[in-house]
A protein has these predicted regions:
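Charged, gly/pro-enriched flexible loop segments at helix/strand junctions
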Residues: 145-182
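Short, solvent-exposed helix-loop connector elements
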Residues: 125-140, 158-166, 183, 201
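Mobile-element integrase/transposase regions
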Residues: 1-36, 44
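Generic recognition of stable, solvent-exposed alpha-helical segments in well-folded globular domains
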Residues: 15, 57-60, 84-88, 117, ...
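Mobile genetic element proteins and their domesticated derivatives, centered on retroelements
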Residues: 18, 37, 43, 62, ...
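Active-site beta-loop-alpha junctions of metal-dependent nucleic acid enzymes
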Residues: 30, 38, 47-70
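RNase H-like two-metal-ion nuclease catalytic core shared by retroviral integrases
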Residues: 78-80, 84-93, 100-126, 137-144, ...
Length: 253
């Protein structure tokens, strides 16, 4: 794959991308997926949900998400799924002079940054339910429009600076916690002053508690929709307590 810029995790603009499936334990039929796009240097993350993982939906979501970053995207790293490894995305990366790399087959640590966001943002916010309707898709994206504000402006993160093994013990050193917003403002070589001014204006009126309440309200609405599809489920059998059973256990003589 064409390399337009040397991959540099310390520079804003190099992102990892990944999909999270919302099959709810049932992989049959069509269901929604959520795309996470995470900048390695700053932790800035944009999230978009799509109706399924067809290339055209995923590609459109990638373009929309990367356009929302407060700095230019320089490189994209994905796993080996066909929703990412295809001619359309590669051609676009070449046209935009984006370095496009993919993880090594069988190496689960290559996408560690974005996979952490899959759990912290997607699973902790909307859980493991099955989402497969247009109404649910709309709610998911309304949630992400709010969640991005919490994650990027108010979610402090720590970055690993060093890892030292001494015998069986591993010692890790982290930097001071900082939000993606703060890391973008601290950048001295990539992000322009105008962008930083715009981000400060965007940040000033934000109320994280109010945003969280809005997310909770939308999440409750989403849960109502998905549970309504399931109908009334039989209650699981409850094992009788020893004193409630019809025949008391006896000790063998």
């Amino acid at each position: 794959m064409r390399t337009w810029a040397e991959w540099d995790d310390a520079v804003p603009g190099f992102v990892e991308i990944d999909l999270v499936g919302h099959e709810g334990g049932n992989s049959r039929g069509e269901f929604c997926f959520t795309l996470d796009v995470t900048d390695i240097a700053t932790g800035w993350t944009e999230t978009r949900s799509v109706r399924n993982k067809a290339q055209k939906w995923v590609f459109a979501a990638i373009k929309d998400a990367t356009a929302a970053f407060p700095f230019a995207i320089l490189g994209i790293d994905s796993d080996n799924g066909s929703e990412f490894i295809n001619r359309e995305l590669l051609t676009w990366c070449e046209q935009e002079n984006l370095t496009f790399t993919r993880s090594r087959s069988g190496n689960k640590n290559d996408g560690a940054h974005v996979e952490q966001k899959n759990w912290h943002i997607v699973r902790q916010t909307v859980g493991y339910h099955r989402y497969d309707t247009a109404a649910e898709l709309d709610l998911l994206n309304r949630i992400w429009a709010l969640q991005r504000l919490l994650t990027n402006h108010f979610g402090p993160q720590q970055k690993l600076l060093a890892k030292v093994r001494t015998g069986a013990k591993i010692s890790k050193t982290y930097d001071r916690p900082a939000t993606p917003f703060q890391r973008v403002l601290a950048d001295t070589g990539t992000v322009s002053r105008d962008v930083k001014k715009r981000l400060r204006r965007e940040n000033k009126p934000l109320n994280p508690a109010a945003i969280q309440r809005q997310i909770q309200a939308l999440s409750a609405e989403l849960l109502t929709l998905t549970t309504a599809k399931q109908g009334t489920k039989p209650q699981p059998a409850i094992r009788a307590k020893p004193n409630d059973s019809t025949k008391q256990p006896q000790r063998a003589s």
